[in-house]
A protein has these predicted regions:
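Glycine-rich phosphate-binding loop of ATP-dependent small-molecule kinases
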Residues: 1-212
């Protein structure tokens, strides 16, 4: 089964991907990992991508999608795969179809923006050991102090309120077009990501007709 996972930052997409990898025994493939592997393996597409990256430029769609097509043709993807980070645009989605990369289901994990803001802006990370906390879901015993090492808890730049709102705006601007595209193809399923991790995962498996 070939899947694409969509979800705003903080929606729990990474957690659901990990569960699906375990339950369906298929790999999750991220754009970043694919690029790193192609470059490390010295493939022709990898070498071309490295030239763009070394020059500080974005890797063109045709190279990204060529690397995707190569990766999903590998033996470990014969039983299916989960794509993460691609497609990001309508042009990439259309090119993926044109390249013959078969997608069975596109799962969109839906969480209200206000809830996502609460999830992300409430996160705290220890500046010393990297331990993670949340001011409501997983608070430290002493406010602002790491339980593990006593280090100071900080707010990452990515979790600052204005940054979170900007990231959500960008996500919606690009993803609504993708949802419309795959919805017209009859492949889009939407799952409530505000419920428990376990219930959301059950709903995903039911929506895609997976037997586990």
């Amino acid at each position: 089964m070939n899947l694409i996972l969509l979800g705003a930052p903080g929606a729990g997409k990474g957690t659901q991907a990990e569960l699906l990898v375990h339950k369906l025994s298929i790999p999750a493939i991220s754009t970043g990992n694919m690029l790193r592997e192609a470059i490390a393996n010295g493939t022709e597409l990898g070498r071309k991508a490295k030239e763009y990256m070394d020059a500080g430029n974005l890797v063109p769609d045709e190279l990204i999608l060529g690397i995707v097509a190569d990766r999903v043709a590998q033996p470990d993807c014969q039983g299916g795969f989960i794509l993460d980070g691609v497609p990001r645009t309508l042009a990439q989605a259309e090119a993926l179809e044109a390249a013959g990369v078969k997608i069975d289901h596109v799962v969109s994990i839906e969480v209200d923006d206000r809830e996502i803001e609460g999830r992300m802006t409430g996160r705290r990370v220890c500046g010393k050991c990297g331990a993670s906390f949340h001011i409501t879901a997983n608070p430290p015993k002493i406010d602002g102090i790491c339980d593990s090492c006593g280090g100071e808890l900080i707010i990452r730049k990515d979790d600052a309120p204005e940054t979170v709102r900007n990231r959500l705006a960008v996500y919606h601007a690009t993803t609504e077009v993708l949802k419309d595209f795959y919805g017209k193809l009859g492949r889009l399923v939407e799952v409530n990501g505000s419920q428990s991790i376990e219930k959301a995962n059950e709903d995903i498996l039911a929506a895609i007709g997976a037997k586990v």
